[in-house]
């Protein structure tokens, strides 16, 4: 059941390693793997097909489904962005014109550039995995596309997305926007976010709901827990990766929250329900939550090493 999520990770890694690290032999190896993946996708009508001959559930970039099937409305923009990036990266890595032709076909005949004008459907900051995918992919697409008209369209979609996401104070998202557009990208907030980031990457129990916080109750309308309108500083909240929710106040206190909820007469007491129930010092997060945005910004000249 390989999904589009996994393909995003592969192509982001292949492209950056190819451009920044690989020697000639490694470039040949990367090109061989990328060609196998893209040929499979194109040979199967823009799908990943498993060994049983059935397409996997989520690895779908079929333009007819994305453009015409309402069940794919939330993936339409995101998956359009993905496949255009895969193809452009594939052409850059392999030189195979088949991928450039497929890119132009999706732009010309299937209006995928139009799909990217507002590729993010705003969701009240509830679906963070796709946000991360989008910023990873747009950073590559803007690297490999030279056409000024296409770049302006893609930048329009990125700006629409970032205008919504900048409330999260996500340093990586801010840096991608700045690197790809040359516009002001809230550098000061991003630097503060990284400077405040805990050295201890263990997921400890956190309880912040007792505080006088600004609660956003809208998620409860779709059966989700309340969250904050504004994320807490990095050292006060759960350790976050780029694809996790920075608006959650608590972590690892399910039992305590349930006890308070059942004993309280306050109808809003359920705001104490935590985002997770298993953070008890048993998980260690990857250091890339810090190093990835930091070195991305250093590479693009957005920040400098402190003296």
Regions found by a protein language model. Give the residues of each.
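Extended HEAT/HEAT-like alpha-solenoid repeat tracts in very large eukaryotic scaffold/adaptor proteins
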Residues: 2-9, 13, 79-83
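Soluble non-cytosolic domains of exported or imported proteins
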Residues: 4-8, 24, 28, 74-77, ...
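Residue-level signal for well-ordered alpha-helical scaffold segments within enzymatic catalytic domains
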Residues: 9-20, 89, 140, 305
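A surface/extracellular/periplasmic glyco- and lipid-processing/surface-interacting theme
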Residues: 11-51
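Ser/Thr/Asn(+Pro)-rich, low-complexity disordered segments
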Residues: 37-84, 89-307
């Amino acid at each position: 059941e390989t999904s589009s999520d996994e393909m995003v990770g592969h192509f982001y890694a292949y492209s950056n390693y190819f451009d920044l690290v690989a020697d000639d032999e490694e470039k040949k190896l990367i090109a061989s793997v990328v060609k196998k993946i893209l040929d499979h996708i194109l040979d199967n009508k823009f799908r990943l097909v498993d060994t049983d001959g059935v397409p996997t559930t989520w690895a779908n970039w079929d333009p007819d489904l994305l453009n015409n099937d309402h069940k794919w409305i939330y993936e339409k923009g995101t998956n359009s962005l993905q496949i255009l990036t895969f193809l452009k990266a594939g052409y850059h890595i392999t030189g195979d014109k088949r991928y450039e032709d497929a890119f132009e076909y999706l732009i010309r005949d299937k209006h995928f550039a139009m799909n990217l004008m507002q590729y993010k459907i705003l969701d009240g900051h509830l679906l963070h995995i796709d946000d991360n995918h989008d910023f990873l992919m747009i950073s590559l697409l803007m690297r490999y596309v030279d056409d000024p008209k296409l770049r302006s369209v893609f930048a329009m979609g990125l700006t629409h997305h970032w205008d919504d996401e900048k409330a999260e104070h996500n340093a990586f998202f801010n840096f991608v926007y700045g690197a790809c557009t040359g516009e002001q990208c809230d550098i000061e907030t991003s630097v503060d976010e990284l400077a405040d980031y805990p050295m201890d990457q263990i997921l400890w129990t956190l309880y912040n709901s007792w505080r006088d916080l600004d609660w956003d109750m809208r998620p409860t309308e779709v059966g989700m827990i309340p969250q904050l309108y504004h994320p807490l500083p990095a050292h006060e909240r759960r350790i976050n990766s780029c694809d996790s929710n920075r608006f959650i106040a608590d972590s690892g206190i399910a039992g305590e929250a349930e006890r308070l909820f059942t004993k309280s007469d306050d109808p809003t007491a359920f705001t104490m329900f935590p985002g997770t129930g298993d953070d008890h010092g048993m998980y260690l997060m990857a250091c890339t939550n810090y190093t990835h945005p930091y070195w991305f910004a250093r590479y693009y000249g957005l920040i400098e090493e402190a003296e």
